[in-house]
Amino acid sequence: MADGQMPFSCHYPSRLRRDPSGLSLSSRLLDDGFGMDPFPDDLTASWPDWALPRLSSAWPGTLRSGMVPRGPTATARFGVPAEGRTPPPFPGEPWKVCVNVHSFKPEELMVKIKDGYVEVSGKHEEKQQEGGIVSKNFTKKIQLPAEVDPVTVFASLSPEGLLIIEAPQVPPYSTFGESSFNNELPQDSQEVTCT
């Protein structure tokens, strides 16, 4: 084989200068799962095929959160929300977020709405285990989109340990005079006198 030629064809000329062994390393480095499965094997067996890609990635579709730059121009350029914000729901679809809480019991979880955020927290009581005391707790804050009324948010816990938080979108409001109906009051030809 001649020097500088690869044993396979490349569609992108910039890949010719890269080290072939480094390609798989860079894709794993940017992966949030660090090469691990998103769920244990027994949990993934019961999910339908269409739900697994949505639950295992941080962003719907093929984009991973580590591959898209986060900055003020990222929202305008890629349509990616800023850090700490949830993606806006599509028109007509409810807003929905899933949080994996499989290691917590329902009585150990708390969901509350405060200052435009849904706050999910969980806490295990301290347990005596081998060599010490173990305590687990977490808090996750999720910002509500502007299209969602905080009063309509509700949460449910699946048997697999997923906390599903959802809310319907607020229908768009129209100001008086913008709708298609006639703004004028009907004129009656009858006169009524009050005595």
Swiss-Prot record:
InterPro entries assigned: A-crystallin/Hsp20_dom (IPR002068), Alpha-crystallin/sHSP_animal (IPR001436), HSP20-like_chaperone (IPR008978), HSPB8 (IPR043254), HspB8_ACD (IPR042790)
Region (Disordered): 175-195
Organism: Macaca mulatta
Assembly notes: Monomer. Forms a ternary complex with BAG3 and HSPA1A. Component of the chaperone-assisted selective autophagy (CASA) complex consisting of BAG3, HSPA8/HSC70, HSPB8 and STUB1/CHIP. Interacts with HSPB1. Interacts with DNAJB6. Interacts with BAG3.
Post-translational modification: Phosphorylated.
Residue numbers bearing the Phosphoserine modification: S56
Coiled-coil segments: none
Residues with the Asymmetric dimethylarginine modification: R70, R77
Compositional bias ranges of the Polar residues kind: 176-195
Family (UniProt): Belongs to the small heat shock protein (HSP20) family.
Alphabetized UniProt keyword annotations: Chaperone, Cytoplasm, Methylation, Nucleus, Phosphoprotein, Stress response
Gene giving rise to this polypeptide: HSPB8
GO molecular function: protein homodimerization activity
Biological processes annotated in GO: cellular response to unfolded protein
GO cellular component terms attached to this protein's record: cytoplasm; nucleus; protein folding chaperone complex
Protein name: Heat shock protein beta-8
Domain of life: Eukaryota
Principal place of residence: cytoplasm
Biological role stated in the UniProt entry: Involved in the chaperone-assisted selective autophagy (CASA), a crucial process for protein quality control, particularly in mechanical strained cells and tissues such as muscle. Displays temperature-dependent chaperone activity.
Sequence positions bearing Phosphothreonine: T62
Location within or outside the cell: Cytoplasm; Nucleus
Annotated sHSP domain residues: 73-184
